[in-house]
């Protein structure tokens, strides 16, 4: 496999960089060359954050070029739209459905797009696939809202063409989190897997 490119986005405090590092570590353990990159200086709470995970046999540079992302994994719907130009034609946008309206929306200076609008843009302009579910709700069900990132990673492992096996990624997460957090993270991962299987009719 030449390369597989993931763009992870959301707002500060959602665990985006942790998710990028977990996926990068899983790809490394699977024997791929890996590059993980992030945009610094914007990760204050509620500020826009973007991270890149690139892996394969032939990967150079940490930044995913525009139009080259196989997947945009978004922790917040409008953030997927903000970085939509990274998506390749026929790519996948997988997002947490729960919005965190930007300041401009809160102040009445902008309107927040519906999931239907975002889906239309992904499908019509990028010939892509759009999947959204309430990952935060499942993280709370698992036992801690902070595991939203792990719910999303679990879901990602079920998407068509994703090169890393769910069991492999799950094991890396198990080894990476503190011992007392293993159970809640494993449950979060499994709930993400289940949600994706239901959405994808697997």
Curated annotation (Swiss-Prot):
Record's keyword terms, sorted: Oxidoreductase
Entry keyword annotation includes Chloroplast: no
Catalytic activity: indole-3-pyruvate + 2 oxidized [2Fe-2S]-[ferredoxin] + CoA = (indol-3-yl)acetyl-CoA + 2 reduced [2Fe-2S]-[ferredoxin] + CO2 + H(+)
Domain of life: Archaea
Keyword tRNA processing attached: no
Enzyme kind, highest EC tier: oxidoreductase
Enzyme Commission no: 1.2.7.8
A Gene Ontology molecular function term of the record: indolepyruvate ferredoxin oxidoreductase activity
Pfam families registered for this protein in UniProt: POR
Protein function: Catalyzes the ferredoxin-dependent oxidative decarboxylation of arylpyruvates.
Known partners and oligomeric status: Heterodimer of the IorA and IorB subunits.
PANTHER family registered for this protein in UniProt: INDOLEPYRUVATE OXIDOREDUCTASE SUBUNIT IORB (PTHR43854:SF1)
Identification of the protein by name: Indolepyruvate oxidoreductase subunit IorB
Species this protein is from: Pyrococcus horikoshii (strain ATCC 700860 / DSM 12428 / JCM 9974 / NBRC 100139 / OT-3)
Gene: iorB
């Amino acid at each position: 496999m030449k390369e597989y490119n993931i763009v992870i986005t959301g707002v500060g405090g959602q665990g985006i960089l942790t998710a990028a590092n977990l996926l990068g570590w899983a790809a490394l353990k699977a024997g791929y060359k890996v590059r993980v990159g992030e945009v610094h200086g914007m990760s204050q709470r509620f500020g826009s954050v973007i991270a890149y995970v690139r892996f394969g046999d032939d990967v150079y540079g940490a930044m995913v070029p525009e139009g080259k992302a196989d997947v945009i994994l978004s922790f917040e719907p409008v953030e997927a739209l903000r970085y939509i130009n990274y998506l390749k034609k026929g790519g996948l946008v997988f997002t947490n459905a729960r919005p965190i309206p930007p300041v401009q929306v809160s102040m009445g200076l902008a309107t927040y797009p519906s999931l239907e609008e975002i889906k239309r843009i992904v499908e019509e302009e990028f010939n892509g696939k759009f999947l959204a579910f309430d990952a935060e709700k499942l993280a709370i069900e698992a036992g801690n809202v902070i595991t939203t990132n792990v719910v999303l990673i679990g879901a990602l492992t079920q998407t068509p063409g994703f090169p890393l096996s769910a069991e492999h990624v799950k094991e890396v997460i198990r080894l990476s989190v503190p011992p007392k957090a293993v159970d809640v993270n494993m449950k979060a991962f499994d709930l993400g897997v289940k949600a994706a299987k239901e959405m994808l009719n697997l």
